[in-house]
């Protein structure tokens, strides 16, 4: 599972998802990509599940890139614990996704296969996406 090796602060405020992404909206490495069309959080388990679905479909041919990283800790208190007594321990790592962000890229595979593989990967994610290609 993806998670940061070292953080300056162990816990972070929840914050709000709004606006457009500051970068990562264009295809940089590959010829085909998966682009987010809405805001949301994607956790490390979803990222890994989508990556596995992608690589199984293309049978390890070509090359893929994951263009985002889960760098935000999400905390959760245990079940049946009273309120107060501080913030709970880190439960998961998530990536904050804004519309237009490129999530996955790939090259070295035919267009139809890339489209199908990225469609399978998109089913594993919690945000709406669309298929994009280099023009």
UniProtKB/Swiss-Prot annotation:
Cellular component GO terms held in the UniProt record: cytosolic large ribosomal subunit
Record carries keyword rRNA processing: no
GO MF term (any one): tRNA binding
Keyword Hydrolase tagged: no
Biological processes, Gene Ontology terms: translation
Entry superkingdom: Bacteria
Annotated CDD domains: Ribosomal_L16_L10e
Keywords: Ribonucleoprotein, Ribosomal protein, RNA-binding, rRNA-binding, tRNA-binding
InterPro entries in the record: Ribosomal_uL16, Ribosomal_uL16_bact-type, Ribosomal_uL16_CS, Ribosomal_uL16_dom, Ribosomal_uL16_sf
Family the UniProt entry places it in: Belongs to the universal ribosomal protein uL16 family.
Described purpose of this protein according to its UniProt entry: Binds 23S rRNA and is also seen to make contacts with the A and possibly P site tRNAs.
Family annotation (NCBIfam families): rplP_bact (TIGR01164)
Quaternary structure, from the entry: Part of the 50S ribosomal subunit.
Protein name: Large ribosomal subunit protein uL16
Gene that this sequence comes from: rplP
